[in-house]
Amino acid sequence: YGVGPVQGGLYTFTAAAPVAAGLSLFGGGESNASHTAYESGMSAWCGNCHGAFHNNNTQLIHKSGTALGGAYSQIYNLYNGTDDPTGGVQATSYLAAVPFEDAANTTTSTAGPAASSQVSCISCHRAHATSAPDAGRWDFAVTLLAEDGLESGSYVIPDPYASVNQRSLCNKCHNKD
C-alpha cells in the first residue's frame, strides 16, 4: 500500500504507507515494553482519508505530524502519572497508551521521546476502532480515568498507572495535574 489509486480506483492516496513494526498476533497484549513501534508517516497516512484534520481546522487545536520539541518531550519523560507527575525518567517513560513516532523506536523500546520525536494522530487515537468516543485511546470527556466508559457507555480502558486519582492521559504531554 502506498501512493496511488486504492479501492479499485475510487480513491487516490497521496501519502505513502507509514513505517512501523508490529507485534506478532500470538505474542500477547500490548505493554510498555512490547508494543507497535511507530517510526514515521502515520499522520500523513491518516491524512489520505481524514485530511489534515487537526492542522487545518480552527476548532481543533492539536497538531500532528510535527516534532514534540524539548518542552513536550521533557514533560512526557518526567510524567509518571497523576500521583508522581515529575518522577519519571526518559529511559523508561514510554507509555503504550500514548505512543509517538521516532525512527529509533523498536517493538521493545521503553525510552521516551527525544525533542525530534513526533506527535501523531495515533498518539491520542487508534485507527478506526476503540470503545472510546472519537476513536480515542481513552475517553477525552472524562477528568479521571476511573470514569472512563461510564459517561460514554464504552468499554473501560485500563489505567496504565493503576491509580484511582489518575487524570486524563493528555497529561502525559501537557501535564496539567
What are these regions (language model features)?
Residues 1-177:
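A motif-centric signal for short, conserved binding hotspots located
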